Each structure stands twice: as C-alpha cells, then as structure tokens.
From Swiss-Prot:
Cystine connections: 4-54, 13-37, 29-50
This protein's record includes keyword Secreted: yes
GO cellular component: extracellular space; nematocyst
Keywords from the named record: Disulfide bond, Ion channel impairing toxin, Nematocyst, Neurotoxin, Protease inhibitor, Secreted, Serine protease inhibitor, Toxin
The protein's name: TauPI-stichotoxin-Hcr2c
Lineage: Eukaryota, Metazoa, Cnidaria, Anthozoa, Hexacorallia
Site residues by UniProt (Reactive bond for trypsin): 14-15
Length: 56
C-alpha cells in the first residue's frame, strides 16, 4: 500500500529500536534504528511483516 512509499522516519526520540522499512528505490525491506516516537507507517517490527505488507 501507500505506507510503503513513505520515507524512513527515525523520529526525534533517542530510544533504540531495530525496525525495518520498505525502501522504494531498491524495492527491498531494509533495517534501520527507530527512535521510538513520531514515526510513520513505513516502520515494521519484523522483516517478515515488512515483506508481507509491501510485497518485497
């Protein structure tokens, strides 16, 4: 869906969560560190969830 086209958002908080986002340029789900707040929908707890929703 459209959340897969949203940019990666780390957010202003300083927690350390390993998450995955769909990189629309490469067509792959890629790990990133999420700060814990003010993210968007392109933020998945697992690689499997990212691939399932974004069909990567």
């Amino acid at each position: 869906g459209s959340i897969c086209l949203e940019p990666k958002v780390v957010g202003p908080c300083t927690a350390y969560f390993r998450r995955f986002y769909f990189d629309s340029e490469t067509g792959k789900c890629t790990p990133f560190i999420y700060g814990g707040c003010e993210g968007n929908g392109n933020n998945f707890e697992t690689l499997r969830a990212c691939r399932a929703i974004c069909r990567a």
